[in-house]
Amino acid sequence: MMVDVLIKDISQMVTMKGSNGPRRGKDMREVHLIEDGWIAIKGDKIVAVGSGLMEENLKIGKNTMVIDGKGKTVTPGLVDPHTHLVHGGSRENELALKLNGVPYLDILAQGGGILSTVKATRKATVEELMQQGKRSLDQMLSFGVTTVEVKSGYGLNTETELKQLEVIRQLNKEHPCDLVPTFMGAHAIPMEYKEDPDVFVDIVIDEMLPAVVERGLAEFCDVFCEKGVFTVAQSRRVLEAAREAGLKLRIHVDEIEALGGAELAAEMGAITAEHLMVTSEEDMKKMAKAGVIAALLPGTSFNLMVGKYAQARKMIDYGVPITLSTDYNPGSCPTENIQFIMTLGCLAMKMTPEEVFTAVTINGAAAVDRQGDIGSLEVGKKADVVIFNAPNINYIPYHFGINHVDKVLKNGKLVVDKGRVI
């Protein structure tokens, strides 16, 4: 077989070989490293992975791209399973408020936070949203991310929610990264319904959701279950309607106060529960039993300066599968740098480098229901591959604040070279 791409003499390769995940407990440390390895690609698929001498049936031709992996670490394409990528405006004006100790929910109650981004997103044109989205996706790709979950939720009316989701669909067509769309009309209560949130929930269920489903614009539905946002009862209503309409479920819970959202995620069979900064051990056990993946967002804790992080170690001990994400958004976590999030996973949440890589590869893939296609370097999976300028996996979270990516292949095509999108 003539191969299109051969990466050879790889110092360390993280294959993530094994079950399609999600991995949990001690299995999160089993990344199945190969040293002095190689990987062969034909078209958009991985056709062989090994160490030492290449298999005899694989042929290199004059058109084969041969990449030297000496001194490099090679991993599956990274997955960022929780982002708010498409938005208008920015919120640097809130930095001074945060530094003066104004709580996040107080900023939201004053019409800031999510609501200020809603205002900007409603005003933004499709072209403006496309340009902003492409910039952020280029940044993510340069850091090694090849698959991104993207939520709506900065419209809070049918017209703008559809506009956001249409932009997400178009970005998915035009950008190398694969985008997984999530409808999040229940992201906040807009000012016009502040005194009657149940009416807004009716609009999400009866008007927004059918319009989204009719157009095939979303794969998932998400809700922000939090004090001052949506109650457990309201969240359940939205999720039940979304499930009945054929969408898969995810839910923002326990970011600031534990209302019972993690238990709701387990009850509803959500694929992910996200944030989980104040989740009880009892609810961790319920999530583990139900197989809910914990999408942890340490960058948000870092940026909000709350002094606490999700209890990743306890979750791992209880058997909750964990993924990590940037939570990229213009307010509580304005970063596209997944590598910094990996460092926080180690330093702030005491995860091992092996657990961190599991979290951003195969478990990230499971969090967006793509584990059969991506998340590991195995024969038959998509050729989404990252080549890091690092001698081993420990070096990447250890040496933080820079971009370690040398090259990225997406579907077998070189899309990043020398750390730059091409």
From Swiss-Prot:
Enzyme class: hydrolase
EC number: 3.5.2.7
Cofactor: Zn(2+); Fe(3+)
Any one biological process term the GO annotation gives: L-histidine catabolic process to glutamate and formamide
UniProt entry keywords in alphabetical sequence: Cytoplasm, Histidine metabolism, Hydrolase, Iron, Metal-binding, Zinc
Residue sites binding N-formimidoyl-L-glutamate per the record: 154, 329, 331
Annotated GO MF terms: imidazolonepropionase activity; iron ion binding; zinc ion binding
InterPro entries referenced in this protein's UniProt entry, alphabetically: Amidohydro-rel (IPR006680), HutI (IPR005920), Metal-dep_hydrolase_composite (IPR011059), Metal_Hydrolase (IPR032466)
Taxonomic superkingdom: Bacteria
Stretches of the chain forming a coiled coil according to its record: none
Record field: catalytic activity: 4-imidazolone-5-propanoate + H2O = N-formimidoyl-L-glutamate
Protein residues bound to Fe(3+): 82, 84, 252, 327
Signal sequence extent: none
Subcellular location: Cytoplasm
Binding-site positions, 4-imidazolone-5-propanoate: 91, 154, 187, 255, 332
Pfam short name (any one): Amidohydro_1
Pathway(s) this gene product operates in, as recorded in its UniProt entry: Amino-acid degradation; L-histidine degradation into L-glutamate; N-formimidoyl-L-glutamate from L-histidine: step 3/3
Record: residues binding Zn(2+): 82, 84, 252, 327
A GO cellular component annotation in the UniProt record: cytoplasm
Cross-referenced HAMAP family: HutI
Entry-linked NCBIfam families: hutI
Family that this chain belongs to: Belongs to the metallo-dependent hydrolases superfamily. HutI family.
Official protein name in the record: Imidazolonepropionase
Organism of this sequence: Alkaliphilus metalliredigens (strain QYMF)
Gene symbol of the encoding locus: hutI
